[in-house]
């Protein structure tokens, strides 16, 4: 560049500008082919021949205009740092924002082990050295770049990732398409992937028994930390296997225009709680609550994070809600099919049933894990190592392996970091460098409220669930407990929330429709909503900013639209 020998020889680094290469980008495909020739970590100096010449004309070297010319290729002299596309969509939905330090530490600890599941099917994945999750701003961000890379490699649509996990791929129409040549080439590998997924699913019962043994053997807090990491490292690949099967089944269902037909455990949980609320007297409702908690007490809001309380611990809130209420506001029912049609459709919904059952079984172990962690934390409080048992969830592996006398100071430091991270105005999906820039800006300037003065849109688009158009009044909420304590709902209430997980199902019957800012078509909550036949629009970006409490809304799931009237 301008005869700068140090720069062109690779001894110095110039102005580095990173960009996001979209699917179908010609430079990306050309560089990928070049890398196949040389391999390894390399610096490539290249240029594009002078443009603007007449057709057929060449430059002094005989190169046609627009041709890419390789000037030199050399081993990289600087560390190659990935600028991954990261997303909070799925983790924000199931873990909250921000999650506990314990949960973030677990996700970071298993980040590379999880991707080995794909490497057993596609060996090239091991050479990518891509983590499943990246820790930034006290959160575990899903590394969607790794999954997009895998989809591109196999010729599959990138939208298969966002369907199951939420988030967004952008406006590139190529993201929703197959890459025909690659798909045909790797079709045997994809069939092998489905077989491997079935094999892993068939071993889930053995896996759960192994989890039981590990939990039983774990004693102190460091042991419980290791057990939780080991269980998570095994359970995420199983969940991914089920998710892959579910995504395939969902595409078949779209072709057949079949919307519902499964029997999932969270639907039973919701229906049985709704039946309690319909009982005529409070005493009967409270008596039935014991039986309900026996079956579903291991569930709860943000239940994937062990730091979050289960329904068994939230009995006072559930009891108070049942004392005040005699019946739900909006009766829900699953879609009805003839026996023959239901039997024919059920195989298409088995992945839904298996995934929800696996999560339910896993959460029973998570409840036991939480109880054992808190029991050991109480001992730590007695010893003076912690101020309160719940403080243990502000610690992770490195903290727990340190001297217990340091735990209090570590908790204090982590709490300060969490409070600072909580105030960050973070995008749902962004590049690593964009997120780091937001963090640096927050450190350099005092915390301020994000600017929300721009005009709110009157029309929001997302993923529609259900068929019935509903007009009603917006009811905003950020926590399940705030809804359980609330009686003053309008006649046609429409729940508007930033995220949703199956724990919220106990209040679903109280609402005529649901609007969720984040979420995918195949998320746990979306599957439940679909099976109830309830009207909803998920992944309605900007809903919590645009929709005020009491606003008049129309939710149209067929169009996937939310209109402010």
Language-model-detected regions and their locations in the chain:
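Contiguous hydrophobic, helix-prone segments at protein termini
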Residues: 32, 36, 42, 50-65, ...
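Short hydrophobic alpha-helical segments that form membrane-spanning helices or hydrophobic packing faces
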Residues: 17, 72-74, 390-396, 526
């Amino acid at each position: 560049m301008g005869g700068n020998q140090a720069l062109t020889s690779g001894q110095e680094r110039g102005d580095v500008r990173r960009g996001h290469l979209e699917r179908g980008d010609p430079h990306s495909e050309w560089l990928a082919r070049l890398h196949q020739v040389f391999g390894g970590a390399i610096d490539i100096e290249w240029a594009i021949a002078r443009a603007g010449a007449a057709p057929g004309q060449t430059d002094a070297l005989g190169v046609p205009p627009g041709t890419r010319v390789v000037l030199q290729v050399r081993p990289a002299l600087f560390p190659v740092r990935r600028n991954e596309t990261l997303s909070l969509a799925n983790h924000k939905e199931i873990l909250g924002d921000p999650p506990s330090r314990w949960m973030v530490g677990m996700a970071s600890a298993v980040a590379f082990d999880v991707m080995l599941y794909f490497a057993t099917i596609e060996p090239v994945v091991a050479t990518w050295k891509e983590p499943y999750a990246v820790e930034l701003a006290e959160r575990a961000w899903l590394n969607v770049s790794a999954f997009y890379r895998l989809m591109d490699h196999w010729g599959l649509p990138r939208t298969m990732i966002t369907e199951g996990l939420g988030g967004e791929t952008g406006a590139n129409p190529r993201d929703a398409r197959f890459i025909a040549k690659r798909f045909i080439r790797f079709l045997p590998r994809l069939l092998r992937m489905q077989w491997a997924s079935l094999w892993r699913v068939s071993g889930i019962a053995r896996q759960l028994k192994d989890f039981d043994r590990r939990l039983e053997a774990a004693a102190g807090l460091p042991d419980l930390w290791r057990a939780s990491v080991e269980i998570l490292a095994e359970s995420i690949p199983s969940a991914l296997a089920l998710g892959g099967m579910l995504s395939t089944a969902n595409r078949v269902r779209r072709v057949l225009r079949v919307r519902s037909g499964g029997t999932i455990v969270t639907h039973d949980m919701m229906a049985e709680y709704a039946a309690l609320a319909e009982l005529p007297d409070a005493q009967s409702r409270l008596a039935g609550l014991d039986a309900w908690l026996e079956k579903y007490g291991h569930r709860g809001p943000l239940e994937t994070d062990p730091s979050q309380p289960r329904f068994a611990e939230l009995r006072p809130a559930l009891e108070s809600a049942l004392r005040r209420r005699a019946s739900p506001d909006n009766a829900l029912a699953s879609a009805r099919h003839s026996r023959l049609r239901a039997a024919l459709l059920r195989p298409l919904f088995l992945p839904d049933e298996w995934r929800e059952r696996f999560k339910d079984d896993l959460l029973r172990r998570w409840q036991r894990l939480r109880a054992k962690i808190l029991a050991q934390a109480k001992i730590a409080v007695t010893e003076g190592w912690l101020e309160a048992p719940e403080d243990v969830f502000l610690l992770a592996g490195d903290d727990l392996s340190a001297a217990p006398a340091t735990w209090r100071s570590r908790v204090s430091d982590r709490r300060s970091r969490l409070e600072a991270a909580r105030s960050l105005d973070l995008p749902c999906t962004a590049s690593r460098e964009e997120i780091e820039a937001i963090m640096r800006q927050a450190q350099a300037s005092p915390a301020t409220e994000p600017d929300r003065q721009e005009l709110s849109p009157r029309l929001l688009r997302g993923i529609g669930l259900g068929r019935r158009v509903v007009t009603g009044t917006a009811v905003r909420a950020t926590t399940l407990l705030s809804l359980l304590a609330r009686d003053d709902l309008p006649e046609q209430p429409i729940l508007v929330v930033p995220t949703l997980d199956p724990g919220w199902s106990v209040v679903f019957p109280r609402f005529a429709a649901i609007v969720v800012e984040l979420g995918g078509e195949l998320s746990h909550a979306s599957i439940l909503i679909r099976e109830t036949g309830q009207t909803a629009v998920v992944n309605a970006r900007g809903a919590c900013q645009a929709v005020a409490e009491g606003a008049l809304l129309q939710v149209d799931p067929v169009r996937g639209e939310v209109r402010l009237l």
